[in-house]
Amino acid sequence: MAGASGSSVVKGIKGMLLDLSGTLHIDNVVTPNAVEALQRLRGAGVKIRFVTNSTKTSDERLYSKLTGLGFELDRNEIFTSLGAAKTLVRQRGYRPLLLLEDEALEQFADIDQSEPHTAVVVGLAPSKFDYQHMNRAFQALLGGADLVGIHKARYYAQQEDKLAMGPGGFVAALEYATDKKAMLVGKPARQFYELALRDMGMLETPEVVAMVGDDVLADLGGGARELGLVRLLVRTGKYRPGDEAGPQVQAQPDGVFDTFADIVEAVVTR
């Protein structure tokens, strides 16, 4: 197995939380041998859930995309930050102003979005990050609305060799302008990981569950570290050399591998 460090930490793994974009695929391209690796992982009896901060499209469209790429998975195995945001909106009875792309807005079609808005929900919405939309959000926040950041990633892998801005900078801009702190519902919020762990029946044994991702902060920081998950970084997607020891990293990953397939190789041959 090439390009792996920390191979020994996977020996006791019985469950795995998998990031999607940048880890299993980059846009419409599957990372090396990821489809076959997922099948091998299932064959080894490892429990799997997919945890993603993808917010540009609805959960149903995301599921269709993944199956179209060749991945075999159940719709109920996918936990999205978009879904977590909708749950929060429902629980609190918010009438949200949604800074989301049109395909993601589909998921909120049954939610009352009338004014006055009681929350501003921000996801990855490149077409909405202009002055008009941001100022409308600013005005709603000044009027008393809560700020909900679906996640706060700084950037994502648009292509293997090209990064693009994530929603984090835009959430931070609204925080700065209004002196409000955003509630974050996706990775790395602890409660987001707990949703998936509970569904797996492994909330009480996080030490035998690995979190796999390409972002040392958004995937492997925060709640992943607090819960004691085995944190495994892949050198695909948004990963750049030295990420694992960056200035904002509070604890380095437990292992670093070239690809998701390399992690699976280490798990099934342990």
Residue ranges and their predicted role:
Residues 1-20, 26-44, 55-79, 83-270:
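Asp-based, Mg2+/Mn2+-dependent phosphohydrolase catalytic module
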